[in-house]
């Protein structure tokens, strides 16, 4: 399955200015906040990546999957890596997750590909 999401960087910037850490803590873990380095483009990219993951899993953000169930880190080459807890990986029958984020013209776009186990 594939999920995709696009986010306005300016919209995220306004939310960060208005709600500060309270906004970030709704969807980012402490380590993800550090990775974003207060850059609106990175914050928007991480938000888009989590939304894209929820779409790839066909559940959206809600009871079955929260923003904080989705963990983002970076590879040694600074590429985004996405994981879920073992519990969620088993629940959704996931073998692997692949992710990509891009920024252009004031937008962040993210794509997530989910490979499922064949049981």
Swiss-Prot record:
It is an enzyme of class 2 (transferase). It catalyses: apo-[ACP] + CoA = holo-[ACP] + adenosine 3',5'-bisphosphate + H(+). One of its GO terms (cellular component) is cytoplasm. Its cofactor is Mg(2+). It is found in: Cytoplasm. Belongs to the P-Pant transferase superfamily. AcpS family. This is Holo-[acyl-carrier-protein] synthase. The gene is acpS.
